[in-house]
Amino acid sequence: MTQAASGIDLFIPEVYDIVWSLIILVIVAVFFYKFFMPKFNAIFDERAAKIQGNIAKAEQARKDADEAKAKYEAQLSTARVDAAKIRDDARAEASHIIADARSRAESDAAQITASAQRSIESQHQQAIVSLKGEVGALATALAGKILGAKLEDNDVQSSMIDSMIDDLGAKK
C-alpha cells in the first residue's frame, strides 16, 4: 500500500495526471483552433465588415447632409441676393413712379394755372369791352345832360368815350 500523502503533497497532483491533462488540453486546443476558431473569425470578420459598412454609410450620409446643407445655404444666399435685388428694383421703380407722378402733377398744375390765367385774361378783356360800352353810353348821356343836348355825331361820341377810358386807365 501506499503511504498517505501529507501536507502540501495533498494539493500537488501526480505526474501522470499532469501529463494526461496536458495531452487532453492540447487535443482540445487543436480541435478548438481547427474547427471553432475559423467560424468565430468568420463571424467576427462579418460583424467587423458590417460595422465598417455602417460607418462608411454614416460617413457618406454625413457628407451628403453636408453637401445638401451647403447647397441649401447657397440657394438661401442666392435667394437673399435676389430678394434684395427685387426690393431695390421695387424701390427704384417706386421712386421713378413717384417722380413721374410728381412731374405730371406739376405739369397739370402749370396747365391749370396757365388756363386759369388765360381765362382771367379773357374775362378781363370781356369786362373791359363791356365796361367800354357801358361807360360810353353813360358818358354820352352825361355829356348830353351837361351840354343840354344829345350828341349825335358818332365820331365825337367815339373820341369822347376813348378819352374817358384813357383817363380811367391812367387813374388805375
UniProtKB/Swiss-Prot annotation:
Primary site of residence: membrane
- Give one GO term, molecular function aspect: proton-transporting ATP synthase activity, rotational mechanism
Cellular component aspect of the GO annotation: plasma membrane; proton-transporting ATP synthase complex
Q: Does the keyword Protein transport apply?
A: no
Classification via InterPro entries: ATP_synth_B-like_membr_sf, ATP_synth_b/b'su_bac/chlpt, ATP_synth_F0_bsu_bac, ATP_synthase_B_chain
Membrane-spanning residues: 18-38
Keyword annotations of the record: ATP synthesis, Cell membrane, CF(0), Hydrogen ion transport, Ion transport, Membrane, Transmembrane, Transmembrane helix, Transport
Where does it localize? Cell membrane
Tell me the membrane topology, using the record's own terms.
Single-pass membrane protein
Provide the assembly information. F-type ATPases have 2 components, F(1) - the catalytic core - and F(0) - the membrane proton channel. F(1) has five subunits: alpha(3), beta(3), gamma(1), delta(1), epsilon(1). F(0) has three main subunits: a(1), b(2) and c(10-14). The alpha and beta chains form an alternating ring which encloses part of the gamma chain. F(1) is attached to F(0) by a central stalk formed by the gamma and epsilon chains, while a peripheral stalk is formed by the delta and b chains.
User: What the protein does?
Assistant: F(1)F(0) ATP synthase produces ATP from ADP in the presence of a proton or sodium gradient. F-type ATPases consist of two structural domains, F(1) containing the extramembraneous catalytic core and F(0) containing the membrane proton channel, linked together by a central stalk and a peripheral stalk. During catalysis, ATP synthesis in the catalytic domain of F(1) is coupled via a rotary mechanism of the central stalk subunits to proton translocation. Component of the F(0) channel, it forms part of the peripheral stalk, linking F(1) to F(0).
List, alphabetically, the NCBIfam families matched: ATP_synt_b, PRK05759.1-3
Which family is this protein grouped under?
Answer: Belongs to the ATPase B chain family.
Q: What is this protein called?
A: ATP synthase subunit b
Q: Which species does this protein come from? A: Bifidobacterium longum (strain DJO10A)
Q: What is the lineage of its organism?
A: Bacteria, Bacillati, Actinomycetota, Actinomycetes, Bifidobacteriales
Gene giving rise to this polypeptide: atpF
